[in-house]
Each structure stands twice: as C-alpha cells, then as structure tokens.
Amino acid sequence: MDYLDQQILMKLKENARQSASDISKEIHLSVSTVIDRIRKMESSGVIESYTVITDEKKTGNDITALMEISLEHPRYNELFIENIKKNPNIISCYYLTGEFDYLLKIACQSSEHLEQIHHWIKDQGGVRQTRTHYVLRTEKNIYSPLPEAKE
C-alpha cells in the first residue's frame, strides 16, 4: 500500500459513500486510477467491507459497557465465541493477555437490559469471572487507524 492508496483510504474513511470522482479531484488522480486502486484494495482484503456507523443513543441503546470475561479453561473458548457472536448487543469482542481472557463492548437499552446480558454471559459454559465497566462518555471512537502516510 503506497501513499496514494493511503490517501484514498483516508477519504473513504471520512465518507465511504464519496464518489471516485470526488476523491479523484481531492487527491489529483484520474477517476479510473482511483477506481482501479479501490478495486485492488477490495480484492486484496485491505478494504474488507463498507458499513454504516450509527449513534447508539439515537438507535435506543443508551448504555455502553465494557465487560471483562475470564474463562475457567481454554477449552471453553470456541463455544464462548460462538455464543457471543449470536448476541447483537455485543458489538466487539477482544481476546486478551493478562488477568481476563476477553473484553466485550456491549450496547444496550438500560441497566436492566445490561443485567440480562450479564446473566446470559454468566450462564455460558466455563465463565469464571466478569468485571463490568459503564462507559460514561466516548472521547474517541475510530475503527482502524492508517499508518502515517509517506510520500
């Protein structure tokens, strides 16, 4: 990935619905070159998908929480992940080093809803311990940074 690919990616990250024509004007490339580079990044897997980022509060999920999960034994990992993927309120799951095995990002409607999700998680086979943190405010939320662009 070179400097021009990074420029195109930065523009797409700002607005994935931006046309190749608009991008080409901003970074001074031909439209066909921009389209070709986007297609190459899609086929190579650099661009995995295009998605919609929603405001959780405006979609009814007023609470965001981070939950640390410790499993009793690694043999529970596969089943745990299968089950976590089925729950639409768990929007991210990270496998960790340290005291806990997983960190979940959860978006839910209320404290009661979070409590239901917490009980559901505790009922999964092999869950030994959980620790939950309420998010008071999100200060930064990006999905993947790009390395510093070099010309």
What are these regions (language model features)?
Residues 1-151:
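A compositional/biophysical signature of low hydrophobicity enriched in polar/charged and small residues
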